[in-house]
Amino acid sequence: MPKQKTHRASAKRFKRTGSGGLKRFRAFTSHRFHGKTKKQRRHLRKASMVSSGDFKRIKAMLTGLK
């Protein structure tokens, strides 16, 4: 049986934290900032953690990620 490969698109979008969680970056950050408030833009800069509902599915795609 062949080895399971890491999903490369997911590997570029998620980073593993020291405690074993997954860090992700926010959507809606590429353009059209004139329609967003300063507070929205500030919060979009910060990374957040992957929700518990998505964690199991994403972890399966990142088998080879350390």
UniProtKB/Swiss-Prot annotation:
Taxonomy, superkingdom: Bacteria
Bias kind Basic residues: ranges: 1-16
InterPro entries registered for this protein in UniProt: Ribosomal_bL35, Ribosomal_bL35-like, Ribosomal_bL35_CS, Ribosomal_bL35_sf
Tagged with keyword Transcription: no
Residue ranges the record marks as coiled coil: none
UniProt family annotation: Belongs to the bacterial ribosomal protein bL35 family.
Protein name, entry field: Large ribosomal subunit protein bL35
Species annotation: Streptococcus uberis (strain ATCC BAA-854 / 0140J)
Classification of source organism: Bacteria, Bacillati, Bacillota, Bacilli, Lactobacillales
